[in-house]
Each structure stands twice: as structure tokens, then as C-alpha cells.
Amino acid sequence: QFLDMIFDVCKNIAMPLHIYDRNSHRMSHFFEFRFPKNAGLHMHNQLPYTETGTVYKRYAVSLNVNSITNSETMCSRRLLEILACGGILVTNNSPVVERQFRNFCHVVQDASQAQEVLARLAAGPGPEDKERAAAGAVYVRSHHTWQHRLEQLADTVNF
């Protein structure tokens, strides 16, 4: 539902959406998620993981959708990657976003919020948006690297 709402808002404000489909290489899309054909989406094939940072930096705004929205700890890897790259991020809310990332991204919950934020960002991010993104990059690099997770895992299992 959130993704459909974002597609509608972007279409209404004529904000182009570029989607890099991680499932584009699959032979059968019968059971796979299909993007709507009438949403004005610019579809791209999947990328090698090593190119994702370059792609995130190419766009003024990146969208994230957390499919798990009730977890205290789970968020998409994409959220961390976009923030780590210094990207301006628009995302849906979840407990972990609220607790750890709210200050570094634009959290939208409904169509009116999404329209307001995305229309403003489409016109060009302002200094506050850029400062928020830069702070997000510092925060992720300081608290959410693989090294941090491995240390946390080692501590948890008394390794």
C-alpha cells in the first residue's frame, strides 16, 4: 500500500521514478512482485552490488520502503546504504526508523505528507536536507557498519 501511494504521488507531481529491479534477471515473474505499468516508472535491470553506491549518489532523492514495519530492529539494508552514501532519503515509518534514523531521513506516513515532501525535494533539496543527509552518513558510518554488527554478534554469543 505504501509503495502504491508513493507511485501515485510521484506520478501526480511528475517526479520521475527510476527503479533498479533486483528480480529482472529471473526467467519467470509469475510469483514475483510486478511493478505497475501505468505508474510512469523508468525500469532498469538489476545492478551488481558494487555499483549501488554510485547509483544512489546519482539521484537527488532516494526512496525506501520497509516491508517489515513493526520491528524494533529490522530495516532494509537499502536504508542504511542510502544514508551511508549521504543520500537524501524518503521512507515509511517503523519502530527502528523512529528510534534510530528519523533525524536523518524524511519519514512520510500518508499521501499528503509524501506529496509535500517529494514536491519540495523534486524542486531541489535545500541546505537542511543536505545537512540531514550528511549527518546520516556520519551516523551510519559511526554505528551501523558490518564491523559493528560482527562485534555485536560476537558479544551476544560470548565469542
Predicted features along the sequence, with ranges:
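Nucleotide-sugar donor-binding catalytic core of glycosyltransferases
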Residues: 1-103
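Residues at or immediately preceding the N-termini of alpha-helices
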Residues: 49, 94, 111-115, 126, ...
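A charged, aromatic-enriched C-terminal amphipathic alpha-helix characteristic of glycosyltransferases
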Residues: 123-157
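Residue-level signal for the nucleotide or nucleotide-sugar donor/cofactor binding architecture
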Residues: 77, 109, 144
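Residues lining hydrophobic/aromatic ligand-binding pockets adjacent to catalytic sites
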Residues: 4-7, 53, 108, 125, ...
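CheY-like receiver
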Residues: 55, 117-120, 156
